[in-house]
Amino acid sequence: YLGVVKKEWNGFNILQTSAGRTGALDIGFIPSKKGLNAKQIFSKADEGDLSFIWLMGVDNKDVLKLKKPFVVYQGHHGDVGAHIADVILPGAAYTEKSATYVNTEGRPQLAKQATFPPGDAKEDWKIIRAFSDYVKNKLPFDDLESLRNKLYDEFPHLGDIDEIKKARWSKFGTKGKIDNIELKSSIENFYNTCSISRTSETMAICLNNNINKIAAE
């Protein structure tokens, strides 16, 4: 017993390896009963059982394994996902759109557009809304306000901007043996964890300085 969760203090949290994962989990963005998780998707794609994959800003190195399916990439900064895609739908970075985010505490936050997306890039919801028209399955919103109203109707806590909702705890985990292996961070390089930081000259300098510092030690 670690004693990190008490009535007067909650010292337990999870640092997700993807910035959008906390918000995605909040709206139930997980595989359905007959759905596949990420590992299974890559495995099925490699076996030739999946013919089509739509990457929503997915830029981790695992996407390089997608050799067989037809790949649509929606994102920005031309990162790994764009390099292997058959079709690219240029999206907007967080500075180029107004959006709702959820931080690692579970606190909903609003971001306001600071600049316009370059070229033909569009806000992500506009891309998906346009595609829904193309496949004749129109989504029930036409602007950001109606989209947010729909979001807040289904997930009211996301409308409580800058507030943290008390977590509903339940039992989790399973019993099992712990392997005798080294515990280490799942993130090897904190300077290049997303498509924006990987194209940043400043972060490249920080990374090189850190590498040189470690080498000197």
Language-model regions, residue ranges each:
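Non-catalytic alpha/beta scaffold blocks inside enzyme catalytic domains
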Residues: 1-165, 213-217
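Long, low-complexity segments enriched in small/aliphatic residues
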Residues: 148-217
